[in-house]
Structures are given as structure tokens and as C-alpha cells.
Swiss-Prot record:
A GO-annotated cellular component: cytoplasm
Catalytic activity of the protein: (S)-dihydroorotate + a quinone = orotate + a quinol
Name of one Pfam family that matches: DHO_dh
Protein's UniProt name: Dihydroorotate dehydrogenase (quinone)
Amino acid sequence: MYYPFVRKALFQLDPERAHEFTFQQLRRITGTPLEALVRQKVPTKPVTCMGLTFKNPLGLAAGLDKDGECIDALGAMGFGSLEIGTVTPRPQPGNDKPRLFRLVDAEGLINRMGFNNLGVDNLVENVKKAHFDGILGINIGKNKDTPVENGKDDYLICMEKVYAYAGYIAINISSPNTPGLRTLQYGDALDDLLTAIKNKQNDLQAIHHKYVPVAVKIAPDLCEEELIQVADSLLRHNIDGVIATNTTLDRSLVQGMKNCQQTGGLSGRPLQLKSTEIIRRLSQELKGQLPIIGVGGIDSVIAAREKIAAGATLVQIYSGFIFKGPPLIEEIVTHI
């Protein structure tokens, strides 16, 4: 496979520049016959989750295609699902650059992107043009300048706009790069948000005559007490699924490595064990009443199987995809 050569060239570039260049090329081919260049045949291995049938258990995690620009090209690589976003009601530039860093020796990434995106209306227009035949998840968040106490309004605005076009909606309350966002994971703030989201979901179901499941994406840095509380809230509010996990603030496994001191969320292999442990504990708390989508450091078939053994129904990749490329998709789907 050609990817090791592509990676070598891309890794000569600044990480965000490499991402932009790759997406430039994918945008050129998406929806054209040139998509054949990235198309991979993978076996069909249907999995039912949140009332939806996924053609295979592997998805692309949110954050790579924030604006839904390359849905068809990414879909052609063999993913059973794509989660686009995180998208916010209004466009925003995100944090200052540089804001994305490779930890090459650890096969990890640190990002402090800050929900840079072109806004929900732009994403919806891109989704309308796409022909992906898998499940499309749309991950939503709040604008940086929206006060946390009004944060739920941003989620409701996005829900309303994406509902008709989403296979499922992911609620991102766990990015470490939007000030105060993670406080929405706790106590009354979480209950208040989930009540509003569930009410909005019911209203939108009546309007659109279809039920779009909602999953909440959580952080890996929850203590035992917080994790029990989150699981309890998700069950009480009849949320449809949970995505575990987002990036970590923990640097214990990357001490002394180049870029390890950068602020932001750490993903990739250093997150693998931590996210798997959260999935295992969540699974014990949820007792099969709510499905888990496992994400965090999956870079091999074994790592994907570990997430499923811990209690995940579906798995997603992001950093592993950056380091291993499209062959990782085929490998995981074939052998999982």
C-alpha cells in the first residue's frame, strides 16, 4: 500500500498544513469518478446500534471532517459510519495557530483546535450534496463566545438544523479546548442540558416523522464518582448512546517527548488504555441498557477488539487513521 510514502511526505509538513493539503485533494475527488483512487472493498458486517443498522462496526471519529467537506471520499474508504463536526451555530476560527502537534514516537496527537468550523448552515449544505450510504453522525457543540450558562441554546439550534439530515446526533460536552465546556458533564448542568435535548428530540421527531438518536460524547478524565453520575444521568434521560471517549489532559504516558508540554487534548496510542478503562467501567454501570461507541487510541485490530471486549458496540478511529492511513480501515473491518 502506498500510504507509508504518503505519510512520509505529509509528516514533512506542519500537521495542520498536512491536514489542509489532504482535504484539498479529497475535496477535488469527492463525488467524482476519481473517488476510485481511495475506494476500498471491505466486508459487510452489519451491527445494530441505537436502532440503526451500521454496515460495519468501524466509524470515523469527529474532528477530522469538521465541515462535512469530504463525506463521499471518506465513505469510499470503507467506514461503516462517519461522524462529521464538531459544528457550532455560527462560524468561528478556533484557537490561534499552531494548535495541532504530533507526538511521533508515541503515535499521538495534541490538539487545541477550539471548534474551528464554518458553521452549521454550511455543514448542512455539504451534507445535502453527499451520497454516503453508511450512517452519518453529526457532532454538535457550542460557540466559544456563548456563555456556558446559555450553552444549551447552541446545542438546540444545531439539533434543529441538522436533525433532518443526521443518522444520529452527537452532543460534544467533553472537548478540553472550549473554556468551561466540560462543566456541562456534571450534576445539574448535565441534567438541565439533557432535559432540553430530549424535549427538542421529541419535538423534532413529531415534525420530521423520524426518530434520530442522540449520543453524548464524554471525557476520559472523569473520576469514579463523576462517571457513575454521568451514567445515571444518561439512563434517567433516555439518551440513546454514549461515545467514550474524547481526548485527555493527562500527560503521564508522554513525559519527556517532543511537544508533550503543549496544552490541549491528547489522542492516539497514549489514550488507548485510559479510554478502554472508561468504557469498561461505563459498561458495568449501564448494564447493557445503553450502547457505547468506543474511541481512543485504536490503531490496530487488537486495540479495536479490546474496546469491544470492554463493552463497546461500535468503534471509531481518528489518530490511528492519521498514522496508519486507509489500510487500517480494511484491516479492522476484515478482522474485527
